[in-house]
């Protein structure tokens, strides 16, 4: 977490002089967060039902997908807008950005947006995607997707995108609140089991993640990112 925070703090200034390095650094450190979460899973899966919770299930699935890199999925929104294409290519386009708010009202200041239809392509058997995760059987995959949809309220995001006529590939989901929610749940389970948090980083994050932060997965918040002809893209509430 600390490395991602530090990279995020440097992002704005570095982006002004080297957008590619700034975006690469941020994306790679987010992948490091996912790898660290997988390590957390390895050592604590006996203490917490990872696959019974939508947030932890999504993180492990996205981590595995990015780790194996046998598909073109899960490029960040920053990468798509500024590196995969020129920003001018999107002049006049709108993107629907979905995120999960906190219950204490103070928003999470960092974000990592990926296409929602990438998540569907990887996890939803009904999409019949060539990039579908085939590690689990079809019946289990259906139940997994149903649990994710129910707990993260993804159908509400898809419905809003359809109603407002957003192309499917312009609907994005913020993984950062999902990550925070997942870590909070696991840390609380570990604390309840009497696991000691040792080391500077562990001690620093133990308190906020076990007693201060809580994410509301039941009510996704929606914003619109509008790409204009002048200046940077603008984000507004919808």
What are these regions (language model features)?
Residues 18-48:
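Long, hydrophobic/aromatic-enriched structural stretches that serve as scaffold segments
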Residues 1-27, 50-238:
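Acidic, Ser/Thr/Gly/Pro-rich intrinsically disordered interaction regions
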């Amino acid at each position: 977490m600390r490395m991602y925070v530090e990279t995020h703090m440097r992002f704005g200034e570095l982006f002004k002089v080297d957008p590619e390095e700034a975006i690469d650094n941020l994306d790679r450190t987010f992948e490091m967060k996912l790898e660290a979460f997988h390590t957390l899973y390895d050592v604590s899966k006996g203490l917490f039902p990872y696959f019974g919770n939508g947030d932890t299930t999504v993180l492990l699935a996205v981590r595995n997908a990015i780790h194996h890199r046998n598909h073109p999925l899960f490029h960040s929104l920053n990468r798509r807008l500024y590196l995969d294409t020129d920003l001018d290519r999107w002049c006049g386009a709108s993107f629907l950005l979905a995120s999960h708010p906190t219950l204490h009202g103070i928003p999470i200041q960092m974000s990592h947006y990926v296409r929602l239809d990438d998540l569907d392509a990887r996890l939803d058997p009904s999409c019949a995607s060539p990039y579908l995760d085939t590690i689990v059987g079809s019946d289990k995959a259906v139940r997994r997707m149903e649990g994710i949809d129910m707990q993260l309220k993804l159908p509400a995001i898809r419905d809003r995108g359809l109603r407002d006529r957003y192309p499917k590939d312009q609907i994005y989901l913020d993984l950062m609140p999902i990550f925070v929610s997942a870590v909070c749940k696991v840390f609380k389970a570990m604390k309840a089991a009497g696991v000691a948090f040792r080391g500077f980083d562990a001690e620093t994050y133990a308190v906020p993640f076990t007693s201060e932060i809580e994410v509301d997965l039941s009510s996704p918040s929606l914003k619109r990112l509008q790409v204009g002809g002048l200046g940077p893209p603008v984000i507004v509430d919808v």
